[in-house]
Design a protein with these regions (language model features):
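Acidic donor-binding loop of glycosyltransferase active sites
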Residues: 288-304, 317
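Donor nucleotide-sugar binding/catalytic pocket of nucleotide-sugar-dependent glycosyltransferases
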Residues: 162-201
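Nucleotide-activated donor-binding/catalytic signature segment of Leloir-type glycosyltransferases, i.e.
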Residues: 259-284
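N-terminal strand-loop element at the rim of the active site
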Residues: 26-30, 42-103, 174, 179, ...
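Conserved donor-binding/catalytic core segment of Leloir-type glycosyltransferases
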Residues: 212-229, 235-238, 248-250
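Short hydrophobic beta-strand element within catalytic cores of glycosyltransferases
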Residues: 295-298, 312, 318-322, 331
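Glycosyltransferase donor-sugar binding loop
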Residues: 56-60, 222, 247-262, 279
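Conserved acidic donor-binding segment of nucleotide-sugar-dependent glycosyltransferases
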Residues: 333-345, 351-359
Length: 392
């Protein structure tokens, strides 16, 4: 059945009883992408499907991984099936997994794609799996062109993206890039809201848990620290603004030069104004950071989309984001936050708009309604629609 609204058509489907394999990060691998895979698996199970996640035996070789650990130490989830089966660096493994999928004939193989590093592995598996005349390979895609470019990106992307039957993308920038590689069916669905971090806690308790002085107010920068995320611009904007009674919490593990940012903090005289928690923040601590702060800042230089705003939505936390990639599609100005140019001056002005010109009160009134746009059910609906649009 087709429904028409505002010039767009949507294929309404209700697909149950399918055999679905998800391929991507999941327990014991850490991070937001693993959370996405596990949450999508739960939603497809809830809909009456037979679901299994095939995650990695090797995700990244240790010498290529910039963080301290790729793994969590918590027990595996008991409500979904996760099997460690895929090595991204072993072509013989790709053949084994691809032939296994061809033999087991799942209705759908749903892959999570966020970096061309995965392309040789994923593309090889996809091409073998599709050879049974039954299995459709779909992709829920974060990025096409990576934030840090390499000469192999385009050929790797061509190898993988050309092996996929259909896509669900999360920003118009990715949509435009994707069309340069494939004419396969593709639909938009925004990044769903993360709901696995619990609910907001009392601010004083949150401050106690993360070891900060509750007599100060806090603004939060959260997530892995890479150069494209613009923390240096935020620090310089903070130095220009110099608010009284407010500190900036920087919470996340450095995937870039730590010394570069410490040097900025020192040169700008921000040692007393910045609370640095430079480590990976485990899931059970996330809510304390988002409960201690009254706003989140994403000062990115470039982006396609980001999962961090979806954590903020879970806690109804107002946001300041730069107008790059798909961020302004997710965080609408005056609704969930303030959107600004990706410059030091633009970020400083956005901080002043939020805290000195009344925008905080406006956003707090509107953000609850904005949350309704970001459900996991909607994401899985789009995946099922793309499945129905594809041909074996």
């Amino acid at each position: 059945m087709f429904a028409f609204a505002g010039g767009f058509s949507y294929l309404c489907v209700n697909v149950t009883g399918m055999k679905i394999y998800l391929l991507g990060p999941a327990h014991p691998f850490r991070g937001g992408i693993a959370t996405i895979m596990e949450t999508m698996a739960r939603e497809f199970v809830r809909r009456g499907n037979d679901v299994r996640i095939l995650t990695f035996t090797v995700q990244y070789p240790e010498m290529l991984f910039p963080g301290k650990s790729q793994y969590v130490t918590t027990p595996p989830p008991a409500d979904i099936s996760i099997e460690r089966a895929v090595s991204t660096v072993n072509p013989f493994n790709w053949q084994r997994v691809g032939l296994r999928l061809r033999r087991e004939r799942p209705d759908m193989v749903l892959m999570k794609y966020w970096t061309p590093f995965m392309a040789p592995c994923f593309g090889s598996i996809a091409r073998l799996a599709r050879g049974n005349g039954v299995t459709k390979v779909l992709c829920q895609i974060d990025n096409v062109e990576p934030h840090e470019h390499h000469i192999v990106d385009r050929p790797f992307n061509r190898w993988y993206l050309g092996a996929v039957d259909g896509f669900v993308y999360m920003s118009e920038q990715v949509h435009g890039e994707l069309k340069g590689y494939t004419s396969a069916p593709m639909l938009f669905s925004p990044h769903p809201m993360f709901e696995n971090f619990g609910s907001r806690v009392d601010r004083a308790e949150a401050c106690r848990r993360i070891g900060v002085d509750p007599s100060f107010s806090y603004t939060l920068f959260f997530g892995l620290i890479r150069d494209y995320k613009g923390l240096d611009m935020l620090l310089r904007a903070w130095s220009r603004w110099r608010p009284s009674g407010r500190r900036l919490i920087v919470a996340g593990e450095f995937y870039a030069s730590r010394e570069k940012y410490l040097d900025i903090i020192s040169r700008e005289g921000l040692a007393a104004d910045v609370v640095l928690r430079d480590r990976f923040i485990p899931d059970d601590e996330v809510r304390y950071y988002f409960s201690a702060a009254d706003a989140l800042v994403l000062p990115y230089r470039t982006a396609t989309q980001s999962g961090v705003p979806q954590i903020a939505y879970n806690f109804s936390l107002p946001m300041i984001v730069t107008d790059v990639g798909g961020l302004s599609e997710i965080v609408r100005d005056g609704r969930a936050g303030v959107v600004c140019p990706p410059t030091v001056e633009g970020i400083e002005d956005a901080l002043r708009r939020m805290y000195e010109r009344g925008m905080m009160d406006v956003v707090r009134k509107n953000i609850a309604a904005e949350r309704e746009r970001f459900s996991w059910g909607a994401m899985c609906d789009r995946i099922e629609e793309v499945y129905a649009m594809t041909k074996v």
